[in-house]
Amino acid sequence: MSGPILAAGDEEELLRRSFRIAGHQTSISMERAFWDQFRAMAAADGRSMTDLIADIDAQRSAGLSRALRVYILKRLQAAAQTSPLIGDNS
């Protein structure tokens, strides 16, 4: 793979967003890169971010920000298994 994987930039900026989940106002902090990916996942599912967060919130055992990051990682891992990376000769 060429180029820096962790190039400094806006993707690392920590953003706080507020949502109303289960009748309560909730603030969630994640890096911009995670928010961008989460937004794309919700859109691909035809759902709002709030609805997807509510589902994850109902099933989580850890902090909500952590649960969202793990959810994003697991979705990306599942997608990578069904669509191998370019140049993967295995």
Task: Please annotate each region the language model reported.
Residues L73-S90:
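Short, solvent-exposed charged binding patches
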Residues R16-L73, A78:
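Amphipathic, hydrophobic secondary-structure cores in small proteins
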Residues E11, Q37, N89-S90:
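Short linear motifs in intrinsically disordered/low-complexity regions
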Residues M1-R20:
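A detector of short terminal or domain-flanking linear segments
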